[in-house]
UniProtKB/Swiss-Prot annotation:
Keywords linked to the UniProt accession: Cytoplasm, Methyltransferase, S-adenosyl-L-methionine, Transferase
Coiled-coil blocks: none
Gene Ontology process terms (BP): methylation; protein modification process; protein repair
This protein's encoding gene: pcm
Record: active site: S61
Top-level class of the enzyme under EC nomenclature: transferase
Main function: Catalyzes the methyl esterification of L-isoaspartyl residues in peptides and proteins that result from spontaneous decomposition of normal L-aspartyl and L-asparaginyl residues. It plays a role in the repair and/or degradation of damaged proteins.
Domain of life, source organism: Bacteria
Gene3D superfamilies per the UniProt record, alphabetical: Vaccinia Virus protein VP39
Family: Belongs to the methyltransferase superfamily. L-isoaspartyl/D-aspartyl protein methyltransferase family.
Name of this protein: Protein-L-isoaspartate O-methyltransferase
Pfam families: PCMT
Location(s) in or outside the cell: Cytoplasm
Length: 217
């Protein structure tokens, strides 16, 4: 059996080497047991810097991408955060150690239920899970200080921009369904004004919804 504690330390060291310097993100990832979010058969690779498959044809992002996206949201502590694409729940559990409250939307009920159970087992009482169309956001809990989207959209869903607080940041991959996307950081400057920053090329599963890609199933 792999020494997960040692592997976790090495993972954080690698994140620092690759340019992640947000101490809150590093501390959270250095304490959370990532192996608890990995499907059986892939646990040995829990701390490798690679995406891994989970159920419903989805993936858990590589540790670097998780760290980079959360760090790009510039969370200082106590924020109201929306996550689109709960997946295994790992990213939400990291965010929960930094932010005040996190609301996470997952399209697949099986993934949402499994993530909810993990959160309960870990005692994460500031994570709220909903099954539904992530491209619509979570309007009842808006506005948000940050929105992090773990799936690629054809364009920026308007409801997500509308649910940002002034000064809030939206981190979202935008581009093709099957190829690469650009990771964008959208900052709300005022009611109608938004700044856009390109953070680089990425590859995510598609965001499916009425404000995103159509469901092909």
């Amino acid at each position: 059996m792999r020494n997960f504690e040692k592997a976790r330390v090495q993972m954080v060291e690698q994140l620092v080497h690759r340019g992640i310097h947000d101490t809150r993100v590093l501390e959270a990832m250095g304490t959370l047991a990532r192996e608890k979010f990995i499907d059986e058969g892939f646990i040995e690779f829990a701390y490798d810097d690679t995406p891994l498959p989970i159920k419903n044809g989805q993936t858990i992002s590589q540790p670097y991408m998780t760290a980079f996206m959360i760090a790009s949201a510039h969370l200082g502590g106590g924020e109201h955060v929306l996550e689109i694409g709960t997946g295994s729940g790992y990213a939400a559990a990291i965010i929960a150690q930094i932010a005040g409250q996190i609301f996470t939307v997952e399209r697949y009920s099986t993934l949402a239920e499994a993530a909810q159970q993990r959160f309960e087992d870990l005692g994460c009482d500031n994570i709220h899970v909903r099954t539904g169309d992530g491209s619509n956001g979570w309007p009842e809990e808006a506005p948000f200080d940050a929105i992090i989207v773990a799936a690629g959209a054809p364009e920026i869903p308007s409801p997500l921009k509308e649910q940002l607080k002034p000064g809030g940041r939206l981190i979202i991959p935008v581009g093709s369904m099957a190829g690469t996307q650009r990771l964008l950081c959208i900052t709300r400057k005022s009611t109608e004004e938004f700044d856009e920053e390109d953070l680089g090329g990425v590859m995510f599963v598609p965001l499916v919804g009425n404000k995103a890609w159509p469901d092909m199933n």
